[in-house]
Amino acid sequence: FVEGVDAEDEGSGILMVNGSPTDSNAALFKRGAHSIIDGSGLRVLAEYDTPGWNPEKAQEWVSGQIAQHGGAIAGVYAANDATAGGAIAALRVANVDPLPIVTGQDAELSAIQRILTGDQYMTVYKAIKPQAELAAEVAVRLLHGEKVTAPLEIQGTPATLLDPVAVTIDDIMDTVVADGFWTVEDICTPAYADACEAAGIG
């Protein structure tokens, strides 16, 4: 996201559409995002903690920011794909062209399709297979009465952190399709057939 945003114009910057203020995961995502953005030189024009991760709330807030900041919005960090969809809807309604870079998380099907059409820049994919393999390993150890250890402890809970994967238009086939998370048939519905062909998917 930081590498992709073009915020060289004076006064330009980004919006941060964070997750729900009552979700502890959202607080971690927000802290992690700030740990990168704050040292990047990007200016945060405004940020919003989205109640209930509600895309309509995200859309409403971004609409207000478009009215206030207009063409100064060079990018939108969204904490998940639902809020990214809300942000993009606001940008579309306001006829913002070209669209600023918008990110998301969760590799939702609608987000993959928005990436194909160029509406969304990327999403964060957390592969299921490594999570399942690690969970199975822990379950087997517990079943055998073995002690389970982890390299980290987060809020008093032993934890192993797995690497998330950034998915852009260039690596849809090598990530979510290769892992069977989504199939080509899932992604390339008639409405997205041309975009799939242009991206070499299918």
How does the language model describe each region?
Residues F1-G202:
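A residue-level marker of the well-folded mature domains of exported/periplasmic proteins
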